[in-house]
Amino acid sequence: MIKIDNLPNIFTKAMPVLQRLEDAGFEAYFVGGSVRDVLLDRHVHDIDITTSAYPEEVKELFEKSIDTGIKHGTVTVLYEGESYEITTFRTESGYQDFRRPDHVTFVQNLDEDLKRRDFTINALAMDIRGQIIDLFNGVEDLKKRVIRAVGNPETRFHEDALRMMRAVRFMSQLEFKLEEKTERAIKDNHELLKKISIERIREEFVKMGLGSHSRQAFQVFLDTQLSEDVPNFAGKKDLLSVYPKLQFSPTMETSLWSIIIILLKMPNESIGKFMRAWKNSNAMTEKVERIINLFDLISEHAPTDYELFQAGEETLINTIDVAHILGQPISSEALVDRYMALPIKKSSELAIDGRFLIEQGMRPGAKLGETLNNIRKLVVSSEIENTQEAIEVYLDELK
């Protein structure tokens, strides 16, 4: 049996929680992704605890708790400034919607609880002494760098079809391969993904797209036909098959969506609809639209100073990132140097505003807005100095 002696601080801080449960006569273990990650020597973001104690019994042991999912056996305990999700050992049955169990039964056996987990590498538990409980050879699969469903993969994917997306996501993040039967079960059941909300699919897709192994995972995403069951990807395998051949994997979400849109050869007027279909925020949609606009400009010609000003620093850096990933030859240093040399980089830096123009005798209205815009363009292109005096001279010449 494997024993881990030097546990990260996130575990040692939680030890008193397990100890209190054990002192009360219950079993308690760390479980799931945190155990997997500590075995892989990866950073552990948060921990989950599983116990033989029923939710009400957990609540009796700790002063502060929140009923986060008490119907399914989960209580969040607040202890020493940290929050811990503690879930009762359980079995699940009846998955009519392919998303969540119709029935949850609390059990007193860790083995039964681990059987319901998605993949062997996640069906690992660790006790307070650092001993690893591994019923399904998850440690061996970690060594082999393999993602294998617990038990029958068809059953696991019928229980929650999102697990198919989680499989390719873990491929990307952990740089693992899919076990043969697990991959075949995804290919045979990919249409079940249509039963899952876009929000849940999107979360897994983004994690897959930003993983270090995303190009390899994306190939499996295409080969298993999962791509046929997500918004706007059906019938687009030929266009999307460029993704696995990219020089680099994206590390920013804006780059991920921009690259997908460029590969799909999507007209600019369709971007908003596409992003909404994927349940992206308005802010994310706007950022991606700005990147695509500048990317198109750079692909056609060297952008003017004013076009660089309109794009802004964030959009410029993100667009250069997208071009770099796509292998698009652009003079990125020259573009950044030109942007940094602009007299102003945002409208608020202009020496005058609308009030100044009114003081000069202009009436509020469209003409004033047009004049202000022209002044901004002239300042950005260094045709007028960014001073009130120089702008006054320009206004006098207009009269």
From Swiss-Prot:
Its EC number is 2.7.7.72. It comes from the Bacteria. ATP binds at residues 33, 36, 117, 160, 163, 166, 169. Pfam families: PolyA_pol (PF01743), PolyA_pol_RNAbd (PF12627), tRNA_NucTran2_2 (PF13735). GO terms for biological process: RNA repair; tRNA 3'-terminal CCA addition. InterPro entries: Bact_CCA-adding_enz_type3_sf, CCA-adding_enz_C, CCA-adding_enz_firmicutes, NT_sf, PolA_pol_head_dom, PolyA_RNA-bd. Its cofactor is Mg(2+). Signal peptide: none annotated. CTP binds at residues 33, 36, 117, 160, 163, 166, 169. Mg(2+) binds at residues 46, 48. Keywords: ATP-binding, Magnesium, Metal-binding, Nucleotide-binding, Nucleotidyltransferase, RNA repair, RNA-binding, Transferase, tRNA processing. It catalyses: a tRNA precursor + 2 CTP + ATP = a tRNA with a 3' CCA end + 3 diphosphate; a tRNA with a 3' CCA end + 2 CTP + ATP = a tRNA with a 3' CCACCA end + 3 diphosphate. GO terms for molecular function: ATP binding; CCA tRNA nucleotidyltransferase activity; magnesium ion binding; tRNA binding. Belongs to the tRNA nucleotidyltransferase/poly(A) polymerase family. Bacterial CCA-adding enzyme type 3 subfamily. Homodimer. A single active site specifically recognizes both ATP and CTP and is responsible for their addition. Catalyzes the addition and repair of the essential 3'-terminal CCA sequence in tRNAs without using a nucleic acid template. Adds these three nucleotides in the order of C, C, and A to the tRNA nucleotide-73, using CTP and ATP as substrates and producing inorganic pyrophosphate. tRNA 3'-terminal CCA addition is required both for tRNA processing and repair. Also involved in tRNA surveillance by mediating tandem CCA addition to generate a CCACCA at the 3' terminus of unstable tRNAs. While stable tRNAs receive only 3'-terminal CCA, unstable tRNAs are marked with CCACCA and rapidly degraded. NCBIfam families: PRK13299.1. This is CCA-adding enzyme. It comes from Lactobacillus acidophilus (strain ATCC 700396 / NCK56 / N2 / NCFM).
